[in-house]
Amino acid sequence: MKFTFLAFVLIMFSANDCSNPEAASIESFSYETFTRGSTTMYTVTPDQIKVKSTGVNALENIVNINETEWNAILEKASNIDVSKMSQLKSPTDSRASDAALHAILSVRKNDTIYKTNSFDHGNPPTEVKPLVEAILRLAENVE
């Protein structure tokens, strides 16, 4: 009887932990664009956005963001299954001929980094397009 009760309690705690939304929190987003000789990395965390560029126009700027801005980014990410981001297909392939910058979107969630495959900057897969646009819109205030 004690064993059955103990097993029941363990199962209930396990089930509750798996459904806890806080256990699956997003820590940061990164959007990187690159080509031969230059890269730009946009990193968004709950309290700031950082833009770092290398190459001829190298710069590094950080701007604080508020909770409303962070929540707007989280809202755009809410429809994305981050565990399947690496399976998303790029709608175009202009980066192969240097007609567009390469771009990669990364999401850090529970100390795991999920990334898309490379896609054309300015034309992300439709599943992540609202999130990419929100990050770039927020970054306009940094550069």
Kindly give the residue locations of the regions a language model identified.
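Short amphipathic alpha-helical surface micro-motifs
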Residues: 12-13, 25, 44-46, 85-88
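N-terminal export/targeting and maturation segments
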Residues: 18-54, 60, 64
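Generic detection of short hydrophobic beta-strand segments and adjacent strand-loop junctions
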Residues: 42, 62-65, 80, 112-117
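A short, sequence-level motif marking secondary-structure junctions
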Residues: 45-48, 66-68, 118-124
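A short-motif feature that recognizes glycine-rich, charge-decorated loops
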Residues: 51-85
